[in-house]
Amino acid sequence: MTLLRPTCIAVAMILAGCTAQAPSAETGAPAPAVADAPPATPAPTPSTLGTEPVLGPQPVAALGVGPDGSPLDPMDEAHAPVAAPDHKANDVATTTGADGVLRAQVLLLRQHFSTGEIDGKAGMNVAKAVRAFQKSHGLTVSGELDDATWAALNQDSAPVLMTYTLTQKDIDGPYAPTPERAEDKAKMDRIVYQTMLEMLGERYNAKPELLQSLNPDADFSKAGATLVVPYTRPAQSLPKAGRIVVDKSDGALQLLDADGKLFAQFPASTGSSKFPLPIGEWKLTSVVQDPDYRYNPDILVGQPKDAKPATLPPGPNGPVGIVWMGINKQHYGIHGTPEPGHISRTQSSGCVRLTNFAAQAVATAVEVGTPVTFQE
């Protein structure tokens, strides 16, 4: 299926969460919200520019995203791995301390069991990724990095840290501060990353502070500078998912195959007491890359009294990030975020929120009609 990047797909966070809709072909204005949930397999609606919503899987992104939030070319030779020299995390014997955690985080991610932003720190997201990996590989499920788990992870022999040379494109961006008010966001062409360091963090699914600690003497403002970064290319592409399962208590999104076997997991933010996750059985109705966002202050909490409705442009720092996957319940879906460090640590407005890195990965494995289970 040919991938189209829609420029006018409006995504609204309405009442309990978010929804994706196509603009009116006659006026170019966002289509009004409807009372009923969208059909399970909606027909594509052309926008004023002749594009259509993306209703199928996206191509695999090799190492995350570029400066404008777009997927990097999987065949880009600039991202071929060259092991970072003399770093303990690249040593298979490293199993403890911060370097051991860093090694585990990268290896888990390459097996599609994400710990969220890679930061070299143990915590709840590491433990639940380890548990899921152990379950999927028939190991004793403990959440601990025991010898058997390390043996399974170390079947992947590629380096966990590689060198990367900054390009002029990396330096040039575009980058821009993200305004606080929606009306100011609406004036932007794209809601891009604020800094190159933020972009690099999302490209390699790493906390920006980790990149700084790995490169204490690097000049991040100079094209040609060599950096040490996590090598996050998956060992294998994700297969087609038979089902998405979002577990509220575990704060995770899982992908299962047609036989119900777990093969991937990503941390997720899954609603709040005010806007709870809609427990039940659903299905995907859309998979939209680069969605716009419809802002309606009348139905959102804590908005300025003088705020007005606005359609915000797409971009990685938009409210729903770079991917929207809608379900057949009005206003609800699975999407990215401008704040990857908050995933699984803060609540959402009813939708399922992933890092942009994770949302893009999930979108490669699903399609319209994929069953979705939201469970306690």
Regions of interest found by a model, annotated:
Residues 305-376:
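Exported/periplasmic cell-wall-interacting domains
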Residues 15-17:
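C-terminal motif of bacterial Sec signal peptides marking the signal peptidase cleavage site
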Residues 237-337:
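Gly/Pro-biased beta-strand-loop elements
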Residues 104-108, 119, 129-134, 196-203, ...:
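Short alpha-helical segments in extracytoplasmic peptidoglycan/chitin-binding modules
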Residues 96-142:
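A short amphipathic alpha-helical interaction element
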Residues 24-78:
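Post-signal peptide N-terminal segment of mature Sec-exported envelope proteins
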Residues 124-128, 132-170, 212-239, 243:
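Extracellular LysM carbohydrate-binding repeats and other cell-envelope/extracellular binding modules
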Residues 19-22:
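Bacterial signal peptide processing site
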